[in-house]
């Protein structure tokens, strides 16, 4: 049931581990995209990854999700070494990524779009599903019930029967987040989740993200250019500039770091 503590998971997922990025280096044809980057995402926290354009944020996200392979260094999610794993295998460990661009099937209902997130949790075989055996019907009912719980959690319960493409932009971004939550993730990678939104939409999505951390205990790595959202949500902030880590710590400390000020404003750092 959905309540003040959010929708409890219907799976027996193991505890959320830390994500440890250790001396991560990525080179592309001589270009150093990431240079010996090290940071740790503590379990159940929001960890913002920020920096000017070209700082290496997208490259880092692509390594974390298995799209790119690191030249050297490691990425560990608990006991699992992610470096070199395929995106599919990483997703199977409970890592879900939401891209900046919308990817909902526009003509499918919101409920069916969210149901796609349950795919990796489906145990019924193709034959049983095709024949509509009782086991398949029971599993589908359970998945749809979970979808409705998560839709309620993000504020989309009244829109489940609408085509996903008919939602407002902010609602579609919430639907993307809900679909990722339907995967029962332990780690969420959010790529600019409030980009292009109105102020009201940004506040709403930020509140849902905070609820994911506070109610569900899911770790979140957040790439976002809206510094107001970053400072409100993040427990820890890592700052990249030209592929190098220049700051890592609490938001208030990072915000006042001279190296960060210089990277963003081009001003001379003061002693």
Model-derived segments and spans:
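Glycine-rich phosphate-binding loops of nucleotide-dependent enzymes
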Residues: 2-7, 12-271
């Amino acid at each position: 049931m959905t309540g003040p503590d959010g929708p409890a998971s219907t799976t027996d997922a193991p505890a959320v581990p830390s994500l440890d990025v250790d001396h991560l280096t990525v080179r592309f044809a001589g270009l150093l995209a990431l240079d010996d980057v090290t940071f740790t995402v503590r379990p159940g926290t929001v960890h913002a990854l920020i920096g000017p354009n070209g700082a290496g944020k997208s490259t880092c996200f692509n390594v974390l999700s298995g799209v790119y392979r690191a030249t050297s260094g490691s990425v560990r999610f608990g006991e699992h070494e992610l470096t070199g794993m395929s995106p599919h295998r990483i997703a199977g460990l409970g890592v879900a990524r939401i891209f900046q661009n919308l990817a909902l099937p526009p003509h499918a209902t919101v409920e069916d779009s969210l149901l796609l997130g349950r795919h990796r949790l489906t145990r019924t075989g193709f034959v049983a599903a095709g024949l509509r055996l009782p086991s398949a019907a029971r599993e589908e009912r359970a998945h749809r019930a979970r979808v409705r719980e998560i839709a309620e959690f993000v504020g989309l319960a009244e829109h489940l029967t609408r085509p996903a493409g008919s939602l407002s932009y902010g609602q579609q971004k919430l639907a993307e987040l809900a679909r990722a939550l339907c995967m029962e993730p332990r780690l969420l990678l959010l790529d600019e989740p409030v980009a292009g939104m109105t102020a009201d939409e940004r506040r709403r999505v930020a509140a849902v993200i905070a609820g994911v951390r506070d109610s569900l205990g899911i770790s979140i790595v957040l790439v976002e250019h809206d510094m107001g959202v970053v400072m409100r949500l993040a427990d820890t902030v890592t700052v990249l500039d030209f592929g190098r880590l220049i700051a890592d710590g609490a938001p208030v400390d990072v915000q006042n770091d001279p190296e960060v000020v210089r990277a963003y404003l081009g001003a001379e750092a003061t002693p």
